[in-house]
Amino acid sequence: MKIAVITFPGSNCDSDIYRVLKDQYNAEVDRIWHRDGLDKKYELVILPGGFSYGDYLRSGAMAGFSPVMKSVKEHVDKGGKLFGICNGFQILTEAEYLPGALIRNKTLKYICKTVILTKGSAGNPVTASMDVRKELKIPIAHADGCYYATSDVLKQLEDEDRILFRYSGENPNGSLDSIAGITSKNFKIVGMMPHPERAMNPITGEMDGKVVLDLILGS
């Protein structure tokens, strides 16, 4: 699989996802600087975590206007897959690839901890192979991770099976309906706040990130 990992000024998780894809999936991965375009056809483009453009204005707000996003739009228009992790999810909502917004955590504090995720919508094809009873331990690290949307959008996400994951038990950031990740209507654009790339090695304590990335890469 050919994958592009976009690096914006302030990205700090691009190396993590790049190494995971290279070392554990043997994928063909290119790192793309935000001023450059996608000079080849990729099956998947990843917007990594971090603090793109220093989170000025709002988290992810400025990255949507970065030069590389023109190529990302062309990639999406041709049916390519797009995956945003944490700040990448914020970028996807700011650029209106996904509905809703990621706002300040209910605690008004930065949160860095491992949370429990469960399957969201039963009919979402991305997580179709995941047992509805399975719980995943995945880290979060954000200050603006509270998913917010209007009641109409929340109903649409439910009706269209577009909720990828929910927080189970504790809702760490106050996300409406405990939403931790969602997909586009065609399920080719995926955004989530937790970091699967940080749960890929027993040295760090968790391995459930592999379950998540297997689902994303296999969908």
From Swiss-Prot:
Compartments in which it is found: Cytoplasm
This protein's record includes keyword Ligase: yes
Statement: the UniProt record of this protein carries the keyword Transcription: no
CDD domains associated with the record: GATase1_FGAR_AT
One MF annotation (Gene Ontology) recorded for this entry: glutaminase activity
Highest rank taxon of the organism: Bacteria
Pathway: Purine metabolism; IMP biosynthesis via de novo pathway; 5-amino-1-(5-phospho-D-ribosyl)imidazole from N(2)-formyl-N(1)-(5-phospho-D-ribosyl)glycinamide: step 1/2
Keywords, sorted A to Z: ATP-binding, Cytoplasm, Glutamine amidotransferase, Hydrolase, Ligase, Nucleotide-binding, Purine biosynthesis
Domain Glutamine amidotransferase type-1: 2-219
GO cellular component: cytoplasm
Broad class of where this protein is predominantly found: cytoplasm
Reactions listed under catalytic activity: N(2)-formyl-N(1)-(5-phospho-beta-D-ribosyl)glycinamide + L-glutamine + ATP + H2O = 2-formamido-N(1)-(5-O-phospho-beta-D-ribosyl)acetamidine + L-glutamate + ADP + phosphate + H(+); L-glutamine + H2O = L-glutamate + NH4(+)
Record InterPro entries: Class_I_gatase-like (IPR029062), PRibForGlyAmidine_synth_PurQ (IPR010075)
Matching PROSITE patterns: GATASE_TYPE_1
One example of a Gene Ontology biological process annotation: 'de novo' IMP biosynthetic process
SMART domains on file: GATase_5
Biological role: Part of the phosphoribosylformylglycinamidine synthase complex involved in the purines biosynthetic pathway. Catalyzes the ATP-dependent conversion of formylglycinamide ribonucleotide (FGAR) and glutamine to yield formylglycinamidine ribonucleotide (FGAM) and glutamate. The FGAM synthase complex is composed of three subunits. PurQ produces an ammonia molecule by converting glutamine to glutamate. PurL transfers the ammonia molecule to FGAR to form FGAM in an ATP-dependent manner.
PANTHER family named in the record: PHOSPHORIBOSYLFORMYLGLYCINAMIDINE SYNTHASE SUBUNIT PURQ
Quaternary structure and interacting proteins, as annotated: Part of the FGAM synthase complex composed of 1 PurL, 1 PurQ and 2 PurS subunits.
Name of this chain's protein: Phosphoribosylformylglycinamidine synthase subunit PurQ
